Every structure is written in C-alpha cells, then in structure tokens.
Amino acid sequence: MVSSSVSILGTSAKASTSLSRKDEIKLTPETREASLDIPYKPIIAYWTVMGLCLMIAFGGFIFGWDTGTISGFINQTDFKRRFGELQRDGSFQLSDVRTGLIVGIFNIGCALGGLTLGRLGDIYGRKIGLMCVILVYVVGIVIQIASSDKWYQYFIGRIVSGMGVGGVAVLSPTLISEISPKHLRGTCVSFYQLMITLGIFLGYCTNYGTKKYSNSIQWRVPLGLCFAWAIFMVIGMVMVPESPRYLVEKGKYEEARRSLAKSNKVTVTDPGVVFEFDTIVANMELERAVGNASWHELFSNKGAILPRVIMGIVIQSLQQLTGCNYFFYYGTTIFNAVGMQDSFETSIVLGAVNFASTFVALYIVDKFGRRKCLLWGSASMAICFVIFATVGVTRLWPQGKDQPSSQSAGNVMIVFTCFFIFSFAITWAPIAYVIVAETYPLRVKNRAMAIAVGANWMWGFLIGFFTPFITRSIGFSYGYVFMGCLIFSYFYVFFFVCETKGLTLEEVNEMYEERIKPWKSGGWIPSSRRTPQPTSSTPLVIVDSK
C-alpha cells in the first residue's frame, strides 16, 4: 500500500502564480526577445507574408502620390490659369487662401474618412473595408479630373478623395499589424510609410515630366494615373489573408488558424499557432463578456484605454508638427524662394532621399525599438531646423530680400533639409503609424486609431492652410516653431511612450494594463514568459511517499 503525505509551507497561494514587482525587474530584456511560442526563422522564410503586407501598404502610396503631385500642381501654369485669380499684369495666381484650402482640405477629408469609413473594417472585415474606401477615393478623383475652371469643384473632389485615403490610413496599418509575425510587425507596418515616400517621389517625378506641357496634361495625367493605383490596390486585396483577430471575432476559427499559419510560415497544427490562436480567442471572450465597445469607452480609464488614446493622438499630432509637410507640401515653393532655377528638380532630390531613407527604417524599427528611434529622430530634426531657420533668416539675403539670394546659403539650407528628411523618414514617419497600430485592444482599435490618425489629418490641414500666411509674415523663422515642437516631442516620448518591440498585440495590451512606466518598459516581460523565482512568500510543496 502506498500512502502520501503532503505539507504546504507558505503563506500565500496567490504568490505561487505571480511574480512580485521586484522579481519582474530582475528579468533581462534578452528574455523578452526569446519567443516561447512560434520560433523565429530566417527572414527569407517570411518573404511571402512580407510581400502580402507590402500589397496592403500600397494604400500609403495613394496618399503619398497626392502629397507629391499637389505640391507641383499649385505651381503649374495651366492649373493656376484655371483655378487662380487674374492679376493686374494679366497673369493668374492662386491666392494664399485658395492655395491653403486646396492643399489643406484633403486632410479634412482624410479625418472625416478615418472617423466614419474606418468602421467598415469592423463590419465587413479589413479587406472588404479597404476595397470600399478605395471606391470612395476613385469618386473623388473623377470629380477633380472633371473640374474645368471652378476651383470649388476641384476643392470638393479633394474632400471626397481625402475621405477614401483617411479610411485607408486606418485600415491598412490595422490589417498589417494583425497578420504580420510579431517580431517583424514594426518592419511590416513601416511598409506603409515606405509606400508613402515612394508615392511622393514618383509624384514629384511625374510633375517634372508634365511641366513642359502648357495645357491640362500638366495635372490631369497625374490624376488619371490614380485609377491605375486604385485597381492595383483592389487586386492586391483579393490575394491577402483576412485578419485572424477579425475572423475570431466573427467565429470563423478555421480561417483564423489558416491566416495565422500563413503569416508565420508554419502549419495550422504548429504548437505556436495553437498557442497564439488560443490567446486571441481568450482575449476575445474577455472582450465579449463586457459587451460591445462604445465611443464612451475610449474616454474610460479602465484598462488604461484613455491614456493610450491620448498618447496616440499626441504622437500622430507630433508627427505633423515635426514640420515634415512644410517641405512636402510647399517644397517647390520653398526652393523657388532660395533661388533655385528649377525647384521641381530639387523636389525630386528630396523625394529620392525620403524614399531611400525609409529602407533604413525597415531595419532599425525592430532592431533598436520604437522609443530609441523616436528620441533620436526628435533630437536630430530639431538640430536640422535650427540650422535651416538660422541660415534662412540671417544669411540667405545678405543685401536684403529685394536683392539676389546667396547661393551658398541656399545650398546649406537644401543640405540640412535633406538631413531633416533622412531623420524623419527613418524615425517619426513610420513609427508614428507603428505605435498606433499596435497599442489598442481589438474591441476599440478602429475607433481609437480613427481618432489618433484624425488628429494627424487635422494638423495636416492646419499646416497646409496656414503655412502660406505664416511664411509670408515671418519667413524662415517658421522653422523655430517646428524646432520647439520637436523639443517637446523628445520629452513626451521619454515620459509617455512604451517600448513594444518583440511583443504580440495581446502582450502590448497586458503591458499597458499593468501600467508599466514607459522608461522601464524596455525590460518588461509578459506573464506568459516569466520564470518564477523562489522568494520567502513562494509556497513550498513537499511530498513524502512510501
């Protein structure tokens, strides 16, 4: 006969299943990178899923194309003749008000689209939602191309196309973040910014190619190409998998497993897929237990939702307040002011720097993490603006503004503009989207992202509309305003933005719910990967058998 006696030494059963804060801090950041669920493979094994993410990210190309082309349109002779105002000397010019409205109103449309059309992703799925918003975008392009000499018709078309792009800006990063492997999520979401920069660059090139014409080819051809981009985007959506989190939400479990397996290049029976699927289901059940999400929930402190919403709004706002669109929207105009003979060529150079630099971002965002990149970017861009503004104010016109500008000073300004764009392209440009795409729990994700990205669009409108007035008033001193915003952004990131590198979306949510201090978040370990360490309060189970 075998008998056993069990004695339990310890005072707290709870302590046996959780770590104390002290024990948690002892764990090393390297442990965080060790995946206990789906093992990492060589990056070449993920080419397929990365290609799919690139297709989804093509929505960013559409936005970039608009940014790159509109900066040239407002300087094209036919565009000014049709939509400008007749001057005393017989020429046509766009007034500051009309220029600001035509450039900036696109962002208002984007904000409206993000807040209203982003909801389609929750109702019909991310893929179908993206197809729907692309259709809205096409309607806006048709209105713009059909405009003949009524600037307000073109204005309305930009609002409608902006609504489509706003929906894309919410749904595209969302879908990428939900289908990409967690250790490549930062890189894959950064594809969206890569496509934006490609669109800006090719938009500049197209403007350069059409400026030699004297009729509506100058601006209607670039607009007509938008139909090709829309068709390519829709075809791409047919090929990509649906979000596994959306599929679980709709009860399509087998499809969700296949989507996870496809993203991680394993079979549906792989233990890692089973573990991640079970985690998604468990989190979904918890969300269902508390009912459907409402707009009011975004302003609740429960689950640290409100601090995350505020953080997303501020990060997206600060991306605009870096001053990036000061160059992208008005680059052609700016370099006319510094004496460049062909400012269209200069814009192409800036677009090329922007596009090439973003490839660096694809590497560093998951190599060095979100916080370090944002901090470095804020500091370097602030330095660039100090030099750009100081040279522009004190050295560009040594004999007065009514005299020729200094070529050497103009060259210095262009060089530091390139340094600024390099710093922006590898840090704030992609990472602002990465942050908002991985910060929110699924039940409020689309609403929270819509508000955050909407803030980006609103600031884009304000900068686009008021820049002509501000530069006319204070000139290149405008750069000091952006420098101040960049200094603020440095301290905001340090005190309020958590490091999410190497975490699943569910683990990111867990970290925020535990209210980890952002400057300590780099060493935080998810509960599923913690190794309990013996303490005086840990129960000790002794089994005697005979």
UniProtKB/Swiss-Prot annotation:
Topology, Extracellular side: 66-100, 149-158, 207-220, 342-347, 394-415, 475
Membrane topology according to the record: Multi-pass membrane protein
Subcellular location: Membrane
Example of a GO MF term: mannose transmembrane transporter activity
Keyword Transcription listed: no
Pfam families: Sugar_tr
GO CC list: cell periphery; fungal-type vacuole; mitochondrion; plasma membrane
GO biological process: carbohydrate transport; hexose transmembrane transport
Glycosites: 75
UniProt keyword annotation of Transmembrane present: yes
Ranges facing Cytoplasmic side: 1-44, 122-127, 180-185, 242-324, 366-372, 437-453, 497-546
Alphabetized Gene3D superfamilies for the sequence: MFS general substrate transporter like domains
Main subcellular location: membrane
Keyword entries, A-Z: Glycoprotein, Membrane, Repeat, Sugar transport, Transmembrane, Transmembrane helix, Transport
Record field: transmembrane: 45-65, 101-121, 128-148, 159-179, 186-206, 221-241, 325-341, 348-365, 373-393, 416-436, 454-474, 476-496
NCBIfam families on file: SP
Similarity comment: Belongs to the major facilitator superfamily. Sugar transporter (TC 2.A.1.1) family.
Function: Probable glucose transporter.
The protein's name in its UniProt record: Hexose transporter HXT10
Species whose genome carries this gene: Saccharomyces cerevisiae (strain ATCC 204508 / S288c)
Classification of source organism: Eukaryota, Fungi, Dikarya, Ascomycota, Saccharomycotina
